[in-house]
UniProtKB/Swiss-Prot annotation:
Pfam families: Glyco_tran_28_C, Glyco_transf_28
Presence of keyword Lipid metabolism: no
UniProt protein name: UDP-N-acetylglucosamine--N-acetylmuramyl-(pentapeptide) pyrophosphoryl-undecaprenol N-acetylglucosamine transferase
Matching InterPro entries: GlcNAc_MurG, Glyco_trans_28_C, GlycoTrans_28_N
Gene designation: murG
Protein's job: Cell wall formation. Catalyzes the transfer of a GlcNAc subunit on undecaprenyl-pyrophosphoryl-MurNAc-pentapeptide (lipid intermediate I) to form undecaprenyl-pyrophosphoryl-MurNAc-(pentapeptide)GlcNAc (lipid intermediate II).
Catalytic activity: di-trans,octa-cis-undecaprenyl diphospho-N-acetyl-alpha-D-muramoyl-L-alanyl-D-glutamyl-meso-2,6-diaminopimeloyl-D-alanyl-D-alanine + UDP-N-acetyl-alpha-D-glucosamine = di-trans,octa-cis-undecaprenyl diphospho-[N-acetyl-alpha-D-glucosaminyl-(1->4)]-N-acetyl-alpha-D-muramoyl-L-alanyl-D-glutamyl-meso-2,6-diaminopimeloyl-D-alanyl-D-alanine + UDP + H(+)
GO function terms (MF aspect): UDP-N-acetyl-D-glucosamine:N-acetylmuramoyl-L-alanyl-D-glutamyl-meso-2,6-diaminopimelyl-D-alanyl-D-alanine-diphosphoundecaprenol 4-beta-N-acetylglucosaminlytransferase activity; undecaprenyldiphospho-muramoylpentapeptide beta-N-acetylglucosaminyltransferase activity
Pathway(s) this gene product operates in, as recorded in its UniProt entry: Cell wall biogenesis; peptidoglycan biosynthesis
Main localization category: membrane
Amino acid sequence: MRRVILTTGGTGGHIFPALAVAEEIRARYPECSVLFMGGLYGPEADLAARAGLDFVGLPVRGVLGRGVRAIGAAFGMAAGIARAYAVMGRFDPDIVLGFGGYAAFAGVLAARLRGRPAAIHEQNSVPGLTNRVLSRVVPRVFLSLPDTLGAFPPQKTCLAGNPVRASIVACGAERSDPRPDHVRRLLVMGGSLGARAINDAVVSSLPALAEAGVEVWHQTGAADWERIRKAYAETGHGEGRVEAFIDDVASAYAWADLVLCRAGATSVAELAVAGKPAVLVPYPFATHDHQTHNARWLVSRGAAVLLEQKDISMTDVPALLVGLLSDRARLNRMAVSARAQGRPDAAAAVVDGLVELLKTTPRAR
């Protein structure tokens, strides 16, 4: 493998699995050039740069649900496909792998138009539109969850798991040092972009958490950081660590006893690999409610508790969190259940699949 393009964008749920595969490729093939192709308007350019990857941006945005703005988005998609097509000619990839999102639509379609081998990876239990369309033009579809097997042609599918970055795999392989019973640590994450409903629920819970001696590490998202930071200061919660974005999420997982977060596919996969008990609050407006489906995968196995956003106001959130953090035996059982669902080998399985695909797929020149 000499040159590979990974294409996706929009949210960390698409981006981080791509970065995990990039890590695996570079570990196995140090001379291989990996190019990240994403959108111009999301966090992917910054995240790719932090991972040491070259980046090409495409002027693509979502088309569905944008009303009159869909016209401009459609022109942007056409321009994105044209730019991706030109990049394919210059970079000359051996293979292209898409991880969903509109940038992946442009990138994978351009690869197929150029006659380059291509594959896609679906993270969620309910497939997104991009991958449902692209599955018709690629020979291989990598899946994260068995629930998705019936959504694509069976001869194309490979159940590989959702790739997780090596630092998180290492976190899961190491058992946390035993802590005194009075030490209780809550990690709060609303995804790469934050989650206002989760942020507000935690702020309302701060007095009770402080009284119970709970330490909090809180990822707010950039838009909410200043407001939530002030709320912590006003409530006098001296044990709170508030950040817009946590760069070293593996260290955060290793630190935490319990995680309160959304139920994006990548978050769910990371929780499983890291072996972390969780309270999951699915984003209620996700396409096809896929976050609720993702959450139920862990909840049904005893690794997480489901808290629907519509029920937050009617739920005693402080009692729920403190109750879980005070029950060390239950947390341990949840951790074991989570770890049993993890696929720490997912990135390796995807790269194995790409290598096999290269052996069997003719490449146009």
